[in-house]
């Protein structure tokens, strides 16, 4: 049986956009730094990387759609943090942002990684932004890199 899988090596010339949220920036800024670090460590050229900042998680799918529809980007690394509060707002924003991000990958047939933290409290977000649980921004960018390579090999 033949196995096809992506490798963690940047595909030269592929344009990647990091789309991140301004809301909860004290967490998201760490995710963005992790994503940029992953891109650089795997041989990415900074000229092939663009950072787009949106107000919050609900806006991620719309901007991802516009970026991919432009034809200028080969993949998107979506980053943000939605932290549960006392109202059901968390549930609505998390669910719709998650569905919207997934739909953009399917609609455009391009890799869109999911680096949107959905946590119960600030401590969980901090853990996932570079402490106990690693940096989910770094992980989200490695997904982009692997998926771009996989697409090249299909």
From Swiss-Prot:
Top-tier EC class: transferase
Enzyme Commission code(s) on record: 2.5.1.78
Superkingdom to which the source organism belongs: Bacteria
An example Gene Ontology CC term for this record: cytosol
Pathway annotation from the record: Cofactor biosynthesis; riboflavin biosynthesis; riboflavin from 2-hydroxy-3-oxobutyl phosphate and 5-amino-6-(D-ribitylamino)uracil: step 1/2
GO biological process, one term: riboflavin biosynthetic process
Ligand binding (5-amino-6-(D-ribitylamino)uracil): 23, 57-59, 81-83, 114
Keywords: Riboflavin biosynthesis, Transferase
Active site, per annotation: 89
InterPro entries the UniProt entry points to: LS, LS/RS, LS/RS_sf
Pfam families assigned: DMRL_synthase (PF00885)
Catalytic activity: (2S)-2-hydroxy-3-oxobutyl phosphate + 5-amino-6-(D-ribitylamino)uracil = 6,7-dimethyl-8-(1-D-ribityl)lumazine + phosphate + 2 H2O + H(+)
GO molecular function (one): 6,7-dimethyl-8-ribityllumazine synthase activity
Residues binding (2S)-2-hydroxy-3-oxobutyl phosphate, per UniProt: 86-87, 128
Entry keyword annotation includes Transferase: yes
Family: Belongs to the DMRL synthase family.
Purpose: Catalyzes the formation of 6,7-dimethyl-8-ribityllumazine by condensation of 5-amino-6-(D-ribitylamino)uracil with 3,4-dihydroxy-2-butanone 4-phosphate. This is the penultimate step in the biosynthesis of riboflavin.
Protein name: 6,7-dimethyl-8-ribityllumazine synthase
Organism listed in the record: Sulfurimonas denitrificans (strain ATCC 33889 / DSM 1251) (Thiomicrospira denitrificans (strain ATCC 33889 / DSM 1251))
